[in-house]
A protein has these predicted regions:
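Bacterial Sec-dependent N-terminal signal peptides
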Residues: 1-24
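Sequence signature of WD/YWTD-type beta-propeller architectures
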Residues: 18-201
């Protein structure tokens, strides 16, 4: 067997072993302070993993209970679900409700928060979302991009970048009849104009 492959196997096992395990757990009544707040929501069955974090945690264990099985992840302050296991788990629980149990090590004490629910919709979500990436406030646009995100994983690609146009401001883009085959956006400033993107056969 390849030595590099073996090294990575032992590394992953070692990292998993380093994650603190809950002991002397105290149940609390306040909601789990997870970020982003994914508590009690409905999700499409093809959505990318809902990874989250608890700021200030020194250990974290999350168990998602489905209809017949469960999915467990642990770490320091982040819950990151393996995408392959996540996708197959959601497929098995399509149209059903899942319970999420969060236990976190805060200030030297393990705290068990009340469980919350993820309802898995029987419907899929459209695979892609496009958006304008700009600094908060909209007063400046030194770094401005139009980007496309695959909602079934974390793949992203740049549609347009104002670094390639002399730093011009780019207006929000729109699609014709919600079709990815036809879109447009306006470029302001010197040499500005409306950019039309049309897929041709």
């Amino acid at each position: 067997m390849n030595k590099t492959y073996l090294f990575f196997i032992f590394l992953l096992v070692g990292l998993a072993a380093c994650a603190p395990r809950p002991e002397n757990v105290t149940s609390v009544t306040e909601s789990a302070p997870i970020y982003p707040d994914y508590t009690d929501i409905t999700i499409p069955y093809n959505i990318a993993p809902l990874n989250f974090m608890i700021e200030g945690a020194d250990g974290l264990q999350v168990t998602v209970y489905g209809d017949t099985d469960s999915l467990l992840v642990s770490g320091k302050d982040k819950a990151c679900f393996p995408i392959g296991k996540w996708k197959s788990f959601l497929l098995r629980n399509k149209g059903k409700s899942m319970q999420v149990h969060v236990t976190a090590l805060i200030s030297g004490k393990w705290l068990a928060y009340p469980s919350f629910q993820w309802q898995v919709a029987a419907d899929a979500i459209d695979g892609y979302l496009s958006y304008r990436l700009i600094e908060p406030g909209y007063e400046v646009w030194n770094d401005l991009q139009l980007r496309e995100r695959n909602l079934e994983n974390f793949d992203e690609k740049v549609i347009a970048d104002n670094k390639l146009t002399g730093g011009n401001c780019m207006n929000c883009h729109t699609y014709g009849k919600q079709s990815g085959q036809l879109s447009m956006f306006h470029l302001r400033g010197e040499k500005g104009g409306t950019i039309l993107n049309r897929k041709t056969t």
